Amino acid sequence: MIKKAGVEMDLIQKIKRIEQYVVENFEELDMDDPEEGYWEEYQEIPGASQKEIEAFEKKFSIKLPKDFKELYSYKNGSKYFSILPSTIHDVEMSFSLMSLEQIVKTKQYFQNRDALLTEFPDFFTEEEIEKMRDSRIKPYLFHKQWIPFAEYCDSCFLMLDFDPDKEGKEGQILCYIHDPDEVIYAAAGLSEFVDEIIQTID
């Protein structure tokens, strides 16, 4: 566990540290000034109730990771405040946390079906598919068992993976990147993903 001033930080303390960093470094992160209103709006966002989290799990027939439930008990989404400034495969993306309600709506049109990469021969050659191969991720472009929970520019998403490949782990974080479309491994889980952000900013 990462320490700050000799004291171990839990997940929510780390999130609060990231909040502080984003507010202080929005220009460097190429973001709008949080003082324009969306920081105040973010501060007022409540956490999801246990009942809401359980209903979400039931809807998708999943068991959410403990750290994911902990984060959503703190904040049920972040609206326009980019709470997860990340670098994935050398690409900088500042993700906003989607609310449980947003996730449900998004799943109606995105990651709402199973489609392998091989089903898109006009977009991916056999060589490209082989190059994208990752033994932790099943070779889909769209998969019902992927749950998008954070978004960047309405086109890139962080997703929880509930159907990993043989060397993957349930609950691992994947990133769907648009144009060109690809799905890449981001972290072993939410806690690890947040830890990587903390290590970058501290």
Tell where the protein language model's regions lie, with residue ranges:
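A surface-exposed partner-binding patch
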Residues: 2-151
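Intrinsic-disorder/low-complexity regions
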Residues: 9, 89, 160-164, 180, ...
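Catalytic-core loop-and-flanking beta/alpha module that positions acidic residues
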Residues: 149-150, 162-163, 189-190
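Short acidic, glycine-rich loop/turn motifs
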Residues: 151, 177-179
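Short, surface-exposed beta-strand/loop "edge" segments at domain boundaries and coil↔beta transitions
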Residues: 155-158, 180-187
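Low-complexity, glycine/alanine/valine/leucine- and proline-rich hydrophobic stretches
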Residues: 156-169, 174-177
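Long, compositionally biased interface segments
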Residues: 184-202
